[in-house]
Amino acid sequence: MRSLKLFIAASKDTPDLPGFFQVKYGGEFAARKFLPHLTNFKHAPMLCTKTCYGFRQKLPLDFSEDIAGIMLFPSVLPELIDDAEAYLKEPLPSHDIFIAVGVHPDILIELIKQVPDAGCKAVIVPREDPTWLDASLVEKLKSLCETKGLEYAFPRPFCSLSKGKFKYINNFIDQFKVGKPNYRLVTDEEGNITDVVVTHSSPCG
């Protein structure tokens, strides 16, 4: 199977504070953890310890070529957005998996409506911030995905993402080796642990 391509949408990581009738959606997880992890911290080695960074460089963990595009939105926005499409300034890149992190719900809904036209097969919305999406909105988003013929996952948190009934999401977990951490212990004939092989790590690294 060919490599899956990712389209990632997130809020910008800024110190801006919301004013009246505004709300802030954090971009910290995407900017400081998930994206550096996908690119093996090559653009932000300071976010990883020296020992960790040195070890990671020995492994094929740079998936930069599999990121079709990244779309960043202002972290502070109106509480309600009447015309969410106006915030989509550029055409969506062709991709297989859409991942949204900390995006304004009105913009997220508009993105899910549009991603099928860009070839998207699955939507992953990790809920690192428990206040971001409430249960009723998650059900609405799942229904929208089903209407659009999209696979979906709303892990809370991202490191709880596990394989299930959806083929493309299962392939995403295998290709990018992220989700619920999984490892294998290697022992010698006497039962002593000689090595630990990590097959899947948490998306934050």
Regions found by a protein language model. Give the residues of each.
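Structured beta-strand/loop patches that form or line metal/cofactor-binding pockets in enzymes
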Residues: P155-E190, T194
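A short, well-structured beta->alpha microelement
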Residues: N40-L92, D106-I109
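ADP-ribose/adenylate-binding Rossmann-like module
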Residues: C120-W132
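N-terminal basic/disordered segments at the start of proteins
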Residues: M1-G54
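Short, thiol/selenol-centered motifs that function as redox-active sites or metal-ligating centers
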Residues: V198-G205
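General beta-strand structural signal in soluble alpha/beta enzymes
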Residues: V125, Y152-R156
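Structural motif
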Residues: I8-T14, I99-H104, P126-D129
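Rossmann-fold NAD(P)-binding glycine/threonine-rich loop
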Residues: W132-G149
